[in-house]
Amino acid sequence: MKVLKSLKSAKARHPDCQIVRRRGRLYVICKSNPRFKAVQK
């Protein structure tokens, strides 16, 4: 899980990536390719 300053680049990497907001943080979750998981504080 990477910590990124901005998630625009993370979302563009894979078509299955979704940006989810939980507890004031933005998460990228990717079911088909889990190595793209990221969090933005």
From Swiss-Prot:
Lineage of origin: Bacteria, Pseudomonadati, Pseudomonadota, Gammaproteobacteria, Vibrionales
Record carries keyword Cell membrane: no
GO biological process, any: translation
Similarity remark: Belongs to the bacterial ribosomal protein bL36 family.
NCBIfam families for the chain: PRK00831.1, rpmJ_bact
InterPro entries with a match to the protein in the record: Ribosomal_bL36 (IPR000473), Ribosomal_bL36_sp (IPR035977), Ribosomal_L36_bact (IPR047621)
A Pfam match: Ribosomal_L36
PANTHER family, sorted: 50S RIBOSOMAL PROTEIN L36 2, LARGE RIBOSOMAL SUBUNIT PROTEIN BL36B
GO cellular-component term (any): ribosome
MF terms (GO), sorted A to Z: structural constituent of ribosome
Name listed for the protein in its UniProt record: Large ribosomal subunit protein bL36
Aminoacyl-tRNA synthetase found in the keyword field: no
Highest rank taxon of the organism: Bacteria
Keywords assigned by UniProt, alphabetized: Ribonucleoprotein, Ribosomal protein
